[in-house]
């Protein structure tokens, strides 16, 4: 792949700034990505990038759950032409332990240097996954981190107001985790007799109607 001289120059300069942290970097599809090995270094590294390479804007914080990464609901092979696909089958979900199941991703922008980078880190598995908040560096991280907490259940240390932001406060679970059922755990409706919204257990079967297919 041909990499522009300007992009390579940015990559080399940032790599030099982060040389003491054992950070791995690459340029792929015209984008710069750096991977942090130790999640305890996230705040320090991002602070260094903001100060020394003028990444004054944090455009996004998100996460990925790799629990079922590489697993296919339908096996695509020669047998398919003989038996076809089985539609609407019951979901056979396995929650096997996965090393470094979650990865957190930060998107940074330096308008002064006209460059964007991605910084990511695989998080150690624990009962409570905790990452240092960067809301003190970029105010925009406040709601973005709340969304990651709400959707993935990742906690942010020193966050000023870590509450759910997309689901209601009594919501059970975290919807973007791969082991969260597509139907959810409860459903809500308005009860005319009670004059309020009530929560009831979901009566819909958890089925795979649109399977994920991984083609080789």
Curated annotation (Swiss-Prot):
GO terms for molecular function: NADH dehydrogenase (ubiquinone) activity; NADH:ubiquinone reductase (non-electrogenic) activity; quinone binding. Its main location: membrane. It holds the Pfam family Complex1_30kDa. Keywords: Cell inner membrane, Cell membrane, Membrane, NAD, Quinone, Translocase, Transport, Ubiquinone. One of its GO terms (cellular component) is plasma membrane. It is a peripheral membrane protein. It is an enzyme of class 7 (translocase). Its EC number is 7.1.1.-. It catalyses: a quinone + NADH + 5 H(+)(in) = a quinol + NAD(+) + 4 H(+)(out). SUPFAM superfamilies: Nqo5-like. The keyword Cell membrane applies. It is found in: Cell inner membrane. The keyword Cell inner membrane applies. NDH-1 shuttles electrons from NADH, via FMN and iron-sulfur (Fe-S) centers, to quinones in the respiratory chain. The immediate electron acceptor for the enzyme in this species is believed to be ubiquinone. Couples the redox reaction to proton translocation (for every two electrons transferred, four hydrogen ions are translocated across the cytoplasmic membrane), and thus conserves the redox energy in a proton gradient. NCBIfam families: NuoC_fam, PRK06074.1-1. Belongs to the complex I 30 kDa subunit family. NDH-1 is composed of 14 different subunits. Subunits NuoB, C, D, E, F, and G constitute the peripheral sector of the complex. This is NADH-quinone oxidoreductase subunit C. The gene is nuoC.
């Amino acid at each position: 792949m041909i990499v522009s001289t300007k992009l390579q120059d940015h990559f080399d300069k940032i790599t030099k700034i982060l040389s003491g942290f054992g950070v791995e970097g690459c340029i792929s599809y015209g984008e710069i990505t750096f991977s942090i090995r130790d999640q305890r270094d996230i705040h320090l590294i991002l602070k260094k990038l903001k100060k020394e390479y003028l990444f004054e804007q944090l455009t996004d914080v998100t996460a990925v759950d790799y629990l079922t990464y590489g697993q296919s609901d339908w096996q695509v092979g020669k047998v398919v032409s003989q038996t076809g696909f089985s539609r609407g089958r019951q979901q056979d979900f396995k929650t096997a332990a996965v090393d470094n199941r979650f990865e957190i991703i930060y998107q940074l922008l330096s308008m002064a240097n006209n460059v964007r980078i991605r910084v990511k880190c695989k998080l150690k598995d624990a009962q409570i996954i905790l990452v240092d908040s960067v809301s003190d560096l970029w105010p925009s991280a406040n709601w973005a981190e709340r969304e990651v907490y709400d959707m993935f259940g990742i906690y942010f240390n020193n966050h000023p107001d870590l509450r759910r932001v997309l689901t209601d406060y009594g919501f059970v679970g975290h919807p973007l985790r791969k082991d969260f059922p597509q139907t959810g755990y409860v459903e809500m409706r308005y009860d005319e007799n009670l004059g309020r919204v009530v929560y009831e257990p979901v009566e819909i079967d958890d089925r795979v109607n649109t399977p994920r297919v991984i083609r080789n």
